[in-house]
Every structure is written in C-alpha cells, then in structure tokens.
C-alpha cells in the first residue's frame, strides 16, 4: 500500500497496541513513523541511535534504555522507538516491559522501528530477518514491512 493509506491503516490499528515497522536501511521506516506522529498530540520519540537532529513539535529522548522514559508515559499518546535493536538489554525483556506499559497506560500506543539483519540461522531459508524476529512476531500486535519500489515507499502488512 502507498504511504498515505499505510498511515491511516496503522493509526487505526495503534489503539493501545505495539506495532513494528521494519525494513532495510533507507526504506522509509522513520519517515512513515513521523507521518503517523503528526496525527497525535503527545508523542515521544525514543531515539536510541542518537541521530535525530531536525526540529519537531514532538518530544525526543536520546537514550537506549527504556527505563529512562518510563516516568513520562502517563502523559504520552504515542511512543516511537527508533531503533529497537539499539536498545540496551535483552530484546525479550524489552518487549515484556513494553507489553507491561501497554497494560498499565491505556491511552499509550507504541511503534517499534526495526532493521532487517542478516540471518545466520543455517536451518532457515530466509537470508535476512528483522532483529529479534523470534520475539517480535509473537509479541507485537501488528507488523508492517517497508520497501522502496520504483522510487516510492511501499508498506506491506505482515501481521
């Protein structure tokens, strides 16, 4: 689906859920999340790669530790984590903490931005998979893959 339709679809599905947006580098993941953020009033970007420099009407926390933002969650509508693989700690424990936040803060929705990485599992036929795929395919509510086709961003719903 095209970007505009993808934004509408993802916004409808966010409703107190955890959504993953994954894709290759430069495939529009951060761009898509910023378009989604513009539809929300209180947004916190957790910039774990410490690269966000542009001005924004939203809040930005440059850290790779989820615990650093926990105290402000009751005031936030949307938490965008860019990039999930850069968070400190075990991915399974991180996703459990995010699920706990979703349970405790009923107006909170979470978007995880994730990179596709080389898959070194010899038993798998896929050469590349999203980071912590084994955890995220079970514990995210919806998953979207971004790509670039003919110079345009394309978003595909996986789950």
Spans of model-derived segments:
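The Walker A/P-loop phosphate-binding site
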Residues: 1-55, 71
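Conserved nucleotide-sensing/catalytic segment adjacent to the nucleotide-binding pocket
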Residues: 57-99
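Catalytic-core regions built around general acid/base machinery
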Residues: 97-107, 139
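Phosphate-binding/switch region of NTP-binding enzymes
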Residues: 108-159
């Amino acid at each position: 689906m095209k970007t505009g339709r993808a934004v509408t679809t993802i916004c409808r599905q966010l409703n107190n859920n955890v959504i993953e947006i994954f894709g290759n580098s430069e495939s529009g993941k951060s761009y898509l999340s910023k378009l989604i953020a513009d539809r929300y009033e209180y947004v916190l970007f957790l910039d774990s790669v410490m690269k966000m420099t542009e001005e924004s009407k939203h809040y930005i926390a440059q850290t790779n530790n989820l615990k650093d933002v926990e105290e402000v969650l009751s005031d936030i509508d949307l938490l965008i984590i860019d990039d999930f693989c850069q968070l400190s700690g075990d991915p399974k424990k991180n996703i459990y903490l995010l699920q706990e936040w979703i349970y405790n803060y009923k107006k909170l929705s979470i978007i995880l931005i994730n990179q596709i990485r080389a898959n070194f599992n010899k038993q798998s036929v896929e050469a590349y998979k999203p980071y912590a795929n084994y955890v995220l395919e079970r514990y995210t509510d919806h998953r979207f893959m971004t790509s670039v086709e003919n110079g345009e961003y394309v978003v595909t719903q996986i789950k």
